[in-house]
Amino acid sequence: DFYDWGVGVGLGVLRKLTVPGMLSEGSYHDYIPETYRLLNKDYCWLEAYHFTKSVMEYFKASETFATGVVCGSLYDSRLIRTEPIYNNIFYGHDKMKPVCGATVELLQAGAVKYTYTTDQLFNGVYMFKDVEPGKYTLKVSHPEYDAFEQEVDVTANNVTYQNLALDRTRSTAPEVVKYSPVWKEG
């Protein structure tokens, strides 16, 4: 991007650099759900990973990453965020409450290869880095949610995104509290 604001050509924050530089506008910290995701170091690592790939592409590097990445976020399938901090401004699955403290496993041929526990920072983010290419089973467990499994294909030099809606485990038996019509004797 080049702009002429009367003080020289170029973006102001990059104008006086003496080395190559990049400006990150990959996320919006004033969008509250994104703010919570940015608290997760692995989520921030992903932006650096994409920067690295873009530099490699720009300079037509012959090498690529031999491994892949599996990442995403876990959220409740029914519970909607209601905290006043959100001002009812959220989109897509960001409307749903993230799942904190879930254990996410990546299995290959039934053996656990990688394990990740989602943090308590209300973002539901999980990530597996440097995953060898191949077919895996993504397994999610949490005491308050039904177990979840899904097959994923990991390819070299790519990110496999899996945002997952989890169903809360019902802990109380259903109870009839009212019915109609009411039966009357006589």
Show the residue positions of the predicted features:
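Hydrophobic beta-strand segments
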Residues: C100-L106, L138
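Active-site-adjacent mobile loop/cap segments within catalytic or ligand-binding domains
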Residues: D1-T64
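Compositionally biased low-complexity segments at domain edges in trafficked proteins
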Residues: L166-G186
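Structured interaction patches on ligand/partner-binding surfaces of diverse proteins
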Residues: P143-S171
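Hydrophobic core positions of the immunoglobulin-like beta-sandwich fold
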Residues: M127-K129, L164
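Short, acidic Ser/Thr/Gly-rich low-complexity loop/linker segments typical of extracellular
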Residues: K97, L106-V125
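A short, solvent-exposed beta-strand micro-motif common in secreted/extracellular proteins
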Residues: G124, G134-E144
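A short, amphipathic beta-strand motif
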Residues: G68-D76, L164
